[in-house]
Amino acid sequence: MEQYHGTTIVSVRRGNQVALGGDGQVTLGNIVMKGTARKVRTIYDGKVLVGFAGATADAFSLLDRFEAKLQKYQGHLLRAAVDLAKDWRTDRALRHLEAMLIVADRESTLVITGNGDVLDPEGGIAAIGSGGAYAQSAAKALMENTELAPRDVVEKSLRIAGELCIYTNTNFVIETLE
C-alpha cells in the first residue's frame, strides 16, 4: 500500500527569533488527499516548535515519542533528540518509520532523521521534505540578501517551494518563538 507523503518544512533562525513553517498538502501517490494538514505545531507548553515530513502516521508516532522525551529530559532539546534518534535507530519497530522532524527551541534547531542522525543545521536554516531543497535555497538567499524577520523568510521560502514542488501547496502554518 502506498504511503501518504510529500511536504515542505522549513525553519529559520535570526537573532533571538526562530520560525518554523510547513505547507498543508498530503499526497497519496499522485493524488492530493488533503490540502490543509497541520504539520507544524508547538509542544512543551509552547516552548518547542516541531515540524514533520514523511509518512503521516509515522510522523505522528515520532512526534508523540519526542514529546515524551522532552518531558523526561525536562525540556532539554538536544538530550531528547539524541535519545529519540537512538531509539529510532535501534528499535526494530521504530526502525521502519519513514519520517523526519525539525525541532526548535529558543537556543537551537535540530533535524532528526531515522538514520539516527541529529543535525544542527548551518546558518540557522533547516528544511526537510519533498520541497525542502527549494525552501532551503530560497531561505538562504533571503537571509543573505535581506533583513526580513524569520517568519517572513519562512513564508516566502514556502511560497517558492510551493511554486516549484508538486507535493507542496501554499496553505501554510507558521509558528514562531521569540
UniProtKB/Swiss-Prot annotation:
A single GO cellular-component term from the record reads:
proteasome core complex
Location comes to: Cytoplasm
What reaction(s) does this enzyme catalyze? Answer: ATP-dependent cleavage of peptide bonds with broad specificity
What does UniProt list as catalytic?
Answer: T7
Q: Name one Pfam family in it.
A: Proteasome
Q: Which CDD domains match?
A: protease_HslV
Residue span of the signal peptide, if any?
none
First-listed, main subcellular location of the protein, grouped into a coarse class: cytoplasm
Annotated keywords: Allosteric enzyme, Cytoplasm, Hydrolase, Metal-binding, Protease, Sodium, Threonine protease
Gene3D superfamilies hit by this protein: Glutamine Phosphoribosylpyrophosphate, subunit 1, domain 1
Reply yes or no: does the keyword Ligase apply: no
Q: Which GO terms describe its biological process?
A: proteolysis involved in protein catabolic process
Binding residue positions for Na(+)? G162, C165, T168
Q: Which InterPro entries match?
A: ATP-dep_Prtase_HsIV_su, Ntn_hydrolases_N, Proteasome_sua/b, Proteasome_suB-type
Relate the protein's function as given in its record.
Protease subunit of a proteasome-like degradation complex believed to be a general protein degrading machinery.
Family annotation (PANTHER family):
ATP-DEPENDENT PROTEASE SUBUNIT HSLV, METALLOPROTEASE TLDD
> Hey, which family's this protein in?
Belongs to the peptidase T1B family. HslV subfamily.
- What is this protein's record name? ATP-dependent protease subunit HslV
UniProt source species: Ralstonia nicotianae (strain ATCC BAA-1114 / GMI1000)
